[in-house]
Amino acid sequence: MAHVLGIDLGTTNSCMAIVEGGQPVVLENSEGARTTPSIVAFTKSGERLVGQAAKRQAITNSKNTIYSIKRFIGRKFSEVQEEIKRVPYKVIEGKNGDCAVEVEVAGERRVYTPQEISAFILMKLKADAESKLGEKITQAVITVPAYFNDSQRQATKAAGEIAGLEVLRIINEPTAASLAYGLDKKKDERIAVYDLGGGTFDISVLEIGEGVFEVKATNGDTHLGGDDWDAAIMEWIISDFKKETGIDLHGQPDAVQRIKEEAEKAKIALSSALEYEINLPFITADQTGPKHIQKKLTRAKLEQLTEHLAERTVQPVLNCLKDAKLTAADIDELVLVGGMTRMPKIIEIARKLIGREPHKGVNPDEVVAVGAAIQGAVLKGQVKDVLLLDVTPLTLSIETAGGIATPMIPRNTTIPTRKSQIFSTFSDNQPSVEIKVLQGERPMARDNKLLGVFHLDGIPPAPRGVPQIEVTFDIDANGILHVSAKDLGTGREQKITITGSSGLSKEEIERMTKEAEAYREQDLKNKERAEAKNNADNAAYQAEKLLREYGDKVDSAKKMEVEKCIEKVREVIKGDDTEAIKRAMDELNEKVQAISVEMYRAASSKASAASSPPPPPGAGGQKSDVIDAEFEKVDKDKPQA
């Protein structure tokens, strides 16, 4: 049976896993690493880089290197003004007021949606998994923060489809982590999953036991993660530098990118060390000459700079326990997820809130992908007797008279679920109703997120309050919402799947899928060209080495032919014609083969002459003291005298 790929599509890094023989296995990428940076870059030549290759060139190509795209997926341009200030690449307002990113590819302006950028990351994971397993991967389970709203979930699913994957399930990250933690646990437990990653924070409380994983409550903050800690360190470095030199580095993207990378290194190092030396030579220059940054950051200083961020995890935890109708004393185990939970301060806060030491048996960077792989195996019947009962993180409502948000499905309701309610008209002879679907906890519609709007037309004339309109909310196992409205008098019905006012149509997803596939083909061509250049360059080097060492043993005309072929190879690898490179290399290899045979024969003849035995004694007319003896053949069957 084909594997289902479990994917943790993270803000900073992504990870993938499968279930093999009933056990989850984390897959390494093509570079041999167990996590892949969630970074996409476009080079001046038009090449697309993903992962570590994109990260390596970020400093010199900051405007065309896209990271932390998860902070923009499924969100309106108007919602992300603070996030935009933190990234060197250009975020613009796209279709329907959504976010989009603008880059320059081979001298041309290109606009990509966050779904497409995410799809490029997923395509890399898919390709690496296929290479590792030697089979085609077509299905995946992809994780999202528990506190992602409907638009963000839909957008993540669309990213999977653009990447050529059938997304079997969108699963919440803390829930996935609980699956990885509790798969082999037999006793009943209540666990708290504290998940602080690169861009989001989630807290979930679950009851697990005998294969049942039931989420009791979830809470979080989709604008809080490691990126914010990096930003705090960056601001400290930049503001101190401005005080010392009067130079504001905010307007220098390359300098900002270098500072960001150094801030991230400092943050990671200070999880184990007490101080870190920040060293950024030649960060900029003015009329007095080059400027450098060299300063010490201690763990204590880092904790002071980011205290307000760490404190932001406290209230969601308290709210989650309250919604679950539990206290910290009721929790049996604390599971920490996400790279940020390696920070001593974060561990201390989580420990104080839950009142127990964190469980040490899971890898915070890999546990979510492992859980996604387990869920994939459950859906395919490879892992049995596991039941996952997740919840919807936010209340779903419709707008009613006076701009009130009337709840249909309260937050922390177990999904899948379905809820119907009867509404009526507000005016006499009202011919249609407008259904505004909302998500959030505020009592007034305007203060919640608008997920979508649709109309039910053709209502027969009647006094206000007489028509009966049945509105039904249906949330599937992915946490994605479907809404219908039915006039019970006429039977007329209108249905929509909420793709959000911020979302991609089926046609757009299909178009982007085709474009992504074309990109994949271009990537393969680029890879083939790069390999051809490397092979040709190596062949030229080996031929030169051969001529240096053994050229004196080769006919000068043939030697000249090889030298011409080497020159031709050196010339064609400057261009991009893969076939021409291969032809030149084949011609060179043919000539080298011919002179190699000649050199081998020459060497063999010389060796043969050198190793010939001396003439036997008595040969060549010299007198010998050896006496010749006569021998007679004896027939062994003949009797002897």
UniProtKB/Swiss-Prot annotation:
Q: Does the keyword Cytoplasm apply?
A: no
In this chain, composition skew of type Low complexity spans 602-611
Which residues are the signal sequence here?
none
Q: Keywords for this entry?
A: ATP-binding, Chaperone, Nucleotide-binding, Phosphoprotein, Stress response
Which CDD domains does the record cross-reference, listed alphabetically?
Answer: ASKHA_NBD_HSP70_DnaK-like (cd10234)
Disordered: where is this region? 602-641
The protein's superkingdom reads: Bacteria
Q: What induces it?
A: By stress conditions e.g. heat shock.
Q: Where is the composition biased (Basic and acidic residues)?
A: 630-641
| Any one GO molecular-function label of the UniProt entry | ATP-dependent protein folding chaperone
Q: Which residues carry this modification: Phosphothreonine?
A: 200
Q: Which Gene3D superfamilies match?
A: 1.20.1270.10, 3.30.420.40, Actin, Chain A, domain 4, Substrate Binding Domain Of DNAk, Chain A, domain 1
> Is Membrane given among the entry's keywords?
no
Task: Locate the transmembrane regions by residue number.
Answer: none
Summarize the protein's role: Acts as a chaperone.
Q: Per its UniProt record, what PANTHER family does this chain match?
A: HEAT SHOCK PROTEIN 70KDA (PTHR19375)
Give the record's family classification: Belongs to the heat shock protein 70 family.
State the HAMAP family in the record.
Answer: DnaK
Name of the protein this chain belongs to = Chaperone protein DnaK
